[in-house]
């Protein structure tokens, strides 16, 4: 296919226009008084959302060069969402501010490599300063506070706080749609682990990029599965049962994986294949944990259980399985409570007997997964559109709460970034030339999130930024009440992990745009003339 090429300033300006269009669309959602964006869907009703990454994912621009810029900033939002689960709009407006000011300076003759280096060093310094100023989070109320800020809903915040305090920091919180109008919390037997689906073709919920199976049969296999003849007899029995299938094994590859994928695409058998976590003996032990939770028997050729000879009697079950690209959650496993209890007691005694600190830590992880169970937040609403929006809010709140527990919190509302400018003074003094200018560019960009939070609340962004620059650390604008004060006392806090991810990802993509010298895109296909054009014929 033939290509279109743009060079130098023309390429960078086109990309900047794309960055601007995406950021301008996303920034309206920022802050407690942020607005909604309505997304038309090719099927079903429109989606109404104030979630930055949902808006960003939906944007593709007509001009291919502008679209390059938009896709780069979209990657900032997506990456921040993947790492921290929130902070996508903050990352987007930071990236836009860096690109806008940076390109103006590059056009004026500043060296883009040195400028980018200064921006990178400034981002690292701010990231370290945010970590150093973090307040640890523990306890139901503190977690609820973070979740409330993320979701802008006290009820959701309280539910997430209760869920996290019950299942523990490493526990699993699953979000489901409910058929009722209310949102409620329940605790069930279940387990989660850090492995995702082996093929994106297993995905059933394309918006959330998750594979979800209701009432599946679960096969646990100790070794690799690659041979189709070995797997086929069992697949046929599962297909006859009419239930979906989940396979957890050391690996699933070759013909076996290809067959599962083809069946999923054709919808002849809904299936998901997942690698079992850990290595060696720890993997074998964790499969036994899963066997207790699901009621399955681990298929192990060493113990005389051969895959091609087993039937449905070795299969476990669960009410629901949710698998993303990185995580698996098994909700309401079909195993007997006594079996889970026995497994928990065994793990506790192993922890007591172990001399190795590392072994004790890993056994403790498994114990937390087993004993904690799964907290399920069931989200209900009056309409399909409202339900989707509310479910998104709950998922963001859970992600924010987990991020807060991991690295602590700082004052929210964009003020932590304004106050992090102090960390750049020493760095600025130690650099010279265009690198030092990069630090100045970054310092100026740190005001962007607060500026837009204030603007969306109907205030003058520049005035608010100047005022917050002068208040004590931890103080700032509460955009919900339009007052200034101690933000932590008002419950306006952000997880450090979210803010740091936004800073580092925005800096990374801005440096890419600033140092771009050539942009190459596919030439758009000319619309075909089918010979039926209107040539002024009289009818």
Swiss-Prot record:
One of its GO terms (cellular component) is cytoplasm. Residues 523-533 have a biased composition (Basic and acidic residues). Its EC number is 5.6.1.7. Residues 520-539 are annotated as: Disordered. It is an enzyme of class 5 (isomerase). InterPro entries: Chaperonin_Cpn60_CS (IPR018370), Cpn60/GroEL (IPR001844), Cpn60/GroEL/TCP-1 (IPR002423), GroEL-like_apical_dom_sf (IPR027409), GROEL-like_equatorial_sf (IPR027413), TCP-1-like_intermed_sf (IPR027410). It is found in: Cytoplasm. Keywords: ATP-binding, Chaperone, Cytoplasm, Isomerase, Nucleotide-binding. Its main location: cytoplasm. It comes from the Bacteria. GO terms for biological process: protein refolding. Coiled coil: none annotated. It catalyses: ATP + H2O + a folded polypeptide = ADP + phosphate + an unfolded polypeptide. GO terms for molecular function: ATP binding; ATP-dependent protein folding chaperone; isomerase activity; unfolded protein binding. The keyword ATP-binding applies. ATP binds at residues 29-32, 86-90, 413, 478-480, 494. Forms a cylinder of 14 subunits composed of two heptameric rings stacked back-to-back. Interacts with the co-chaperonin GroES. Belongs to the chaperonin (HSP60) family. Together with its co-chaperonin GroES, plays an essential role in assisting protein folding. The GroEL-GroES system forms a nano-cage that allows encapsulation of the non-native substrate proteins and provides a physical environment optimized to promote and accelerate protein folding. This is Chaperonin GroEL 1. It comes from Mycobacterium ulcerans (strain Agy99). The gene is groEL1.
């Amino acid at each position: 296919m033939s290509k279109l090429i743009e060079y130098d300033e023309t390429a960078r300006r086109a990309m900047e226009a794309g960055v601007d269009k995406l950021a301008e669309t996303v920034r309206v959602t920022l802050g407690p008084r942020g607005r909604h964006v309505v997304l038309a869907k090719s099927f079903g009703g429109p989606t109404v959302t104030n979630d930055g990454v949902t808006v960003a994912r939906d944007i593709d621009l007509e001009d291919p060069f502008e679209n390059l810029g938009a896709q780069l900033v979209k990657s900032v939002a997506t990456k921040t969402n993947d790492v921290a689960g929130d902070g996508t709009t903050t990352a987007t407006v930071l990236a836009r501010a860096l690109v806008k000011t940076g390109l103006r300076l590059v056009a004026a003759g500043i060296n883009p490599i040195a400028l980018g280096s200064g921006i990178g060093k400034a981002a690292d310094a701010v990231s370290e300063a945010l970590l150093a100023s973090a307040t640890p989070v523990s306890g139901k109320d503190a977690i609820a506070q973070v979740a409330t800020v993320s979701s802008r809903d006290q009820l959701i915040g309280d539910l997430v706080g209760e869920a996290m305090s019950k299942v523990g920091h490493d526990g699993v919180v699953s979000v489901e749609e409910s058929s009722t109008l209310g949102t409620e919390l329940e605790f069930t037997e279940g387990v989660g682990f850090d492995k995702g689906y082996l093929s994106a073709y297993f995905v059933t919920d394309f918006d959330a990029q998750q594979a979800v199976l209701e009432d599946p049969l679960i096969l646990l296999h100790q070794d690799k599965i690659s041979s189709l003849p070995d797997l086929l007899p069992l697949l046929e029995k599962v297909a006859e049962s009419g239930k979906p299938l989940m396979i957890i094994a050391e690996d699933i590859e070759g013909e076996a994986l290809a067959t599962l994928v083809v069946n999923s695409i054709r919808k002849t058998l809904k299936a998901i294949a997942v690698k079992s976590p850990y290595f060696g003996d720890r993997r074998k032990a964790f499969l036994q944990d899963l066997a207790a939770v699901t009621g399955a028997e681990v298929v192990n050729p060493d113990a005389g259980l051969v895959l091609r000879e087993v039937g449905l009697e070795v299969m476990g079950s669960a009410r629901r399985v949710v698998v993303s690209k990185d995580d698996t959650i098994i909700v309401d496993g079909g195993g007997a409570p006594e079996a889970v209890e026995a497994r928990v007691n065994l793990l506790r005694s192993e922890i007591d007997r172990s001399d190795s600190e590392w072994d004790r830590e890993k056994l403790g992880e498994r114990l937390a997964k087993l004993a904690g169970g799964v907290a399920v937040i069931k989200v209900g609403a009056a309409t399909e559109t409202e339900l989707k929006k509310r479910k998104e809010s709950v998922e963001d709140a859970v992600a924010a709460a987990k991020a807060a527990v991991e690295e602590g919190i700082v004052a929210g509302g964009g003020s932590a970034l304004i106050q992090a400018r102090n960390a750049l003074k020493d760095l600025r003094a130690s650099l010279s030339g265009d690198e030092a200018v990069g630090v100045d560019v970054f310092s100026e960009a740190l005001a962007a999130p607060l500026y837009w939070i204030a603007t969306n609340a109907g205030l003058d962004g520049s005035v608010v930024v100047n005022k917050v620059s002068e208040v004590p650390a931890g103080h700032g604008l509460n955009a919900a009440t339009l007052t200034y004060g101690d933000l932590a006392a008002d419950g306006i806090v952000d997880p450090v992990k979210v803010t740091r991810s936004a800073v580092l990802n925005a800096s990374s993509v801005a440096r890419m745009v600033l140092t771009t010298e050539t942009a190459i895109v596919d030439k758009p296909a000319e619309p075909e003339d089918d010979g039926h054009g209107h040539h002024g014929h009289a009818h």
